[in-house]
Amino acid sequence: MYRLEQEFNRQGLTLSRQTMANWLLWLYRTSGCAKQAIVLYEYQPTRKAEHAEAFLKGFSGWLHADGYQGYHKLPGNIRVVGCWAHARRKFDEALQTLPKEMQKDAPAAIGECYCSRLFKLEQAFAELTPEERYEKRLEQEKPVLDALLSWANDMQARTAPKSALGKAIHYLQEQWPYLTRYLEDGRLELSNNRAERSIKPFVMGRKNWLFANTPGGAQASSVIYSLIETAKENGLDPYRYLLWVLRNAPGLSETDEAWAEKLLPANAPEECYMPHK
């Protein structure tokens, strides 16, 4: 990136490394209740909401997401579901600003405890049907949510807005309509962790592919990783799957618009799957 910056400077064009690196990878994936898991990565130059709106055109339903405000500008037929892992993390960050001997009885510990209680209840409901989970959430989690909001509203008046705890409380209150939306349907999840796990391969190895020389290269990488991660999510061995694709792709006609669909993970033969233990 440094060499590119210097080369542009020699050509009389000022283009900083920060500008050149200002590219983002968007992730879209199916929920845990989907019969066929799909993981899609899309390269875009910015994080503007218009990219998500274009990608989700024609979609109607729930969208699990973090607290990014851009998602709240999406059409009304897309209902954003907030992430309790992010909310809990805010309280944990507030705790970490305190000496260890003060953390146990700190207000931030109370907020984190409320959030953790929700996750423990979700673990207990994991094997239930969506209909059963919906009922149990209203019965056991709704009271926890009501108590948490009451506590947060009370603490807001006694907490400096710019403090770490103040920011955690503000995030909770601002995101409340989205954080509680998971109560609407038993198929919805408490957090966005499923998507976080899908983006982890890029976070762990981003230095290895930091230098995508062109937008076209970044887009091509997005397609390849979409195929690989979707294959893994569906129990396929990535190596066996790619080997099958490369062996069969040359024999398909590119004039047939459906030729690529035949090579998707959903259509892979049994030989591509991981061996059962």
Predicted regions mapped to residue ranges:
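Catalytic center-proximal scaffold of phosphoryl-transfer enzymes
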Residues: M1-K277
